[in-house]
Amino acid sequence: MKKNTVSEMDQRLGYKFLVPDPKAGVFYRPLHFQYVSYSNFILHRLHEILTVKRPLLSFKNNTERIMIEISNVKVTPPDYSPIIASIKGKSYDALATFTVNIFKEVMTKEGISITKISSYEGKDSHLIKIPLLIGYGNKNPLDTAKYLVPNVIGGVFINKQSVEKVGINLVEKITTWPKFRVVKPNSFTFSFSSVSPPNVLPTRYRHYKISLDISQLEASNISSTKTFITVNIVLLSQYLSRVSLEFIRRSLSYDMPPEVVYLVNAIIDSAKRLTESITDFDIDTYINDLVEAEHIKQKSQLTINEFKYEMLHNFLPHMNYTPDQLKGFYMISLLRKFLYCIYHTSRYPDRDSMVCHRILTYGKYFETLAHDELENYIGNIRNDIMNNHKNRGTYAVNIHVLTTPGLNHAFSSLLSGKFKKSDGSYRTHPHYSWMQNISIPRSVGFYPDQVKISKMFSVRKYHPSQYLYFCSSDVPERGPQVGLVSQLSVLSSITNILTSEYLDLEKKICEYIRSYYKDDISYFETGFPITIENALVASLNPNMICDFVTDFRRRKRMGFFGNLEVGITLVRDHMNEIRINIGAGRLVRPFLVVDNGELMTDVCPELESRLDDMTFSDIQKEFPHVIEMVDIDQFTFSNVCESVQKFRMMSKDERKQYDLCDFPAEFRDGYVASSLVGINHNSGPRAILGCAQAKQAISCLSSDIRNKIDNGIHLMYPERPIVISKALETSKIAANCFGQHVTIALMSYKGINQEDGIIIKKQFIQRGGLDIVTAKKHQVEIPLENFNNKERDRSNAYSKLESNGLVRLNAFLESGDAMARNISSRTLEDDFARDNQISFDVSEKYTDMYKSRVERVQVELTDKVKVRVLTMKERRPILGDKFTTRTSQKGTVAYIADETELPYDENGITPDVIINSTSIFSRKTISMLIEVILTAAYSTKPYNNKGENRPVCFPSSNETSIDAYMQFAKQCYEYSNPKLSEEELSDKIFCEKILYDPETDKPYESKVFFGPIYYLRLRHLTQDKATVRCRGKKTKLIRQANEGRKRGGGIKFGEMERDCLIAHGAANTITEVLKDSEEDYQDVYICENCGDIAAQIKSINTCLRCSKLNLSPLLTKIDTTHVSKVFLTQMNARGVKVKLDFERRPPSFYKPLDKVDLKPSFLV
């Protein structure tokens, strides 16, 4: 879209965010945060994690220690792009090496003596192999161990080795706000987690729980399993902060409702009673006694002083380097929230709110794995040293332990859908279309097991915290993922930050806070606590909070702190806190700034004239107070106006209540929803269904499909959509196409296109309309001896193989053809046989219903021969294939009509597709009609006044009235043909045409809606789903049809189908289908005495039960199905006796004859 199509300033500013910003290093906005996350991990974070120096073991009161040091960490990313990697045939990944030194430190009078135990210099380039966003496999296609056919230059893209398959961004389990829970009436808990900052490695986690029972206020304790003592929360706060109980009372009661003040007084009084119950109470002695009791309880091998230091020093790891007094004031602030939340739960962020969670991006996945595997690696070394010392008396390490850090296996498991050992599996996502390459990395969801374990059923609802940051339309409509996966809106991203940047930013913020007068930031009794990533740094004078937050936001926008994504949240509503967030994993998006009741875009008139030549980073630099990056925490506790139009309609006093203003509605959708048109003009469910169908649309992949041995469906003749949105254009979804323009007619056609049925023109199909090509990977593993077996096999399945045992290039595979030689030979134990060796074919066959051409063959020779075959097939639309518009008007091909059968207009043009007209009324998709009208108007005037092509802007969610679009179409037609009459102009605008009956050549009485639209073909194809068959494979046990279409399975003809035929009186058909044909009937002998199935011993049938009792059984032969016999046998094996009994009635030929009276009738 060109410049002159945008008129509103807020819309133009939103568009500036979507386009690339090379000055800020943003070349592709939708996935920029993923690229930054991964590059930060590879270039910086991995080096920090692997650089380790710490003790493994300690002896003799810590005077002797076994130390480990990992140094010389070298991470080598590739010097070329993924495309160059493909041309070179290289793998696009990063390699890491390091050196491990293990030595013994002994503390002597002269100093510390060091004795080397073992070392390993990791020179192997594959010691740690980190897959990047794209993985090109097999190193070099010319390698003799692995060969390709055709053997040409070009890498082979293997999707399973790519990080693209990782899938959605998971929501962290740890919450940044404490979790409030009602255990039972009058019993509550307040749980929170403390995580060490990123510069502290290894990362320390502590989880605490504050319990409060109204009936036992003395037991208002804080506890943590094995990491902290169980102690009264008020007394702990007093111990750490060194203040009186009256100070704590005043701090908790300040600015609280009366009901909360009453509870505060009760808790403080209970703490006083607890202290008075102990003779000569001293807070230090009380805490020391609890620590000693915990030391005895845990049977710790540490000394009491070491145990106490370990417990209290590591209390609240996120405030590790903070004085204990600040830790005490932090506990008081937590207790304030807890007590307030008991009475006003709805005002506190619940556990399902996105305010409470951070999000794991792709780089964070691998960072977490690197942490865990490094600890496992060091633990294995420690255990090996202990075992060697125990068994041999020496401190030594096996070289195998040093050379297997285990990171490669963990990374491979991640790409297979295994994140952590304790978290179970999650679904991986192969990316088959350009739209999925964007939508999946921008999806946010929960752990699959997280919902089950935590019983978090409420997360399935659309949470208010997701508003503006998540797309409300692109959510799963069915299945286990409903409500658990959300799509980011086009303006949303996830923050990333380096450790060095984190420390510098924290230092600058602390210096800014301490620049205030000392007394103003030391209001610990009645002030507002200021926290940086939940770490308390100061407490501000309540009279200065507004000025502080306003000044902080202004300095942030001006670049004073060097980071524009800092979040500052002013939490009022009696909880009284100023939260400053700087960490990674936060959701952020831009907002328009409102300062003192003025929209800053209105205060900067020169911005409009310069906007066209500026990037988004230029706007942030030269006009810093126009736009602010706001995280979801700050947004939740700020006053945000819905739109600029509503803001300008308010009075001056109302405007001063707002802090921010949102962009137009189109920026609240995700990229998938942006591919739709006018969803606000349709019914609500159409948006959700439309997003699901758009992701199933067949598009054109950018990677080389001939070199990519992977499944995929590709549109052969794609067209760029005419009616688009800015997000669709900037994300390159429009340029990479996902459909074609077709001419549709909304009408009934001979009763064929009922419901979702559509009529498609035969000549349109023959010209390549919506034609696709299917690329499919077939992979088989063959034992090496079977592959090299040269025995002849008479099987017709080998007719497409060459002499090397592989399928020929350009061969057309049919169902039953083998893709590689797999002949198994067996020797018979028969001395009299002339040829006692037999061979038989065990190869896997091609099972698809359609023929495919062999495009590429790859072989990997190891202990087994792995053969990968890439087949291609052009597939034109057939009956049963699914199509849809971008307004969720799906249709299934019901009839393929010849052009002579279709109605035509005055120019002889026939529709390509006929859609049932009643579907518009039932599904209320008005925007589909608007799309047709706009597309037709574009065809009349495709260029603007400067001669440039201009697509039509029709965003997915827009605030433009339908009349405005009608006026646009009217101007297009008046410009191209100014002599049109009013009726002709109206018909042109509303795409109404008179069509002629092909049989009578007479016009229809009513006009028909007739025009072009962008039509999508879905990946639901008939030949991929068909499973019904008459003959095929069966299982060995019950001889039923196999399950699954890929295994040649079919649909079982069972009881319900039988009942249908019985109802129609088809007794013979039932017998043939159920017994003779499908289930293989079998003769069975039944004992009439006991009802058992007779056993066959040396070709003699006998009843085992009766023979043991010396009875003479009477065996009766019946015919039944094989599966019935298997069922009875299995039931008997489980101790369940099923007796087959016979109906006792005399046969008809033994019945006495009726008496016949032979007397003449006249004598009677």
Swiss-Prot record:
Q: What is its EC number?
A: 2.7.7.6
> Can you supply one Gene Ontology CC term for this chain's record?
virion component
A matching Pfam family: RNA_pol_Rpb2_7
Q: Kindly state which keywords UniProt assigns to this record, in alphabetical order.
A: DNA-directed RNA polymerase, Metal-binding, Nucleotidyltransferase, Transcription, Transferase, Virion
Q: Which GO terms describe its biological process?
A: DNA-templated transcription
Q: Where in the cell is it found?
A: Virion
Keyword Metal-binding included in the entry's annotation? yes
What's the catalysed reaction?
Answer: RNA(n) + a ribonucleoside 5'-triphosphate = RNA(n+1) + diphosphate
The record's annotation in InterPro entries points to: DNA-dir_RNA_pol_su2, DNA-dir_RNAP_su2_dom, DNA-dir_RNAP_su2_hyb_sf, RNA_pol_132_poxvirus, RNA_pol_bsu_CS, RNA_pol_Rpb2_3, RNA_pol_Rpb2_5, RNA_pol_Rpb2_7
Function, as annotated: Part of the DNA-dependent RNA polymerase which catalyzes the transcription of viral DNA into RNA using the four ribonucleoside triphosphates as substrates. Responsible for the transcription of early, intermediate and late genes. DNA-dependent RNA polymerase associates with the early transcription factor (ETF), itself composed of D6 and A7, thereby allowing the early genes transcription. Late transcription, and probably also intermediate transcription, require newly synthesized RNA polymerase.
The entry assigns this protein to a family as follows: Belongs to the RNA polymerase beta chain family.
State the oligomer form and interacting partners: The DNA-dependent RNA polymerase used for intermediate and late genes expression consists of eight subunits (147) kDa, (133) kDa, (35) kDa, (30) kDa, (22) kDa, (19) kDa, (18) kDa and (7) kDa totalling more than 500 kDa in mass. The same holoenzyme, with the addition of the transcription-specificity factor RAP94, is used for early gene expression.
Name of the protein in its database record: DNA-directed RNA polymerase 132 kDa polypeptide
Q: What organism does the UniProt record list as the source? A: Monkeypox virus (strain Zaire-96-I-16)
Gene name, please? RPO132
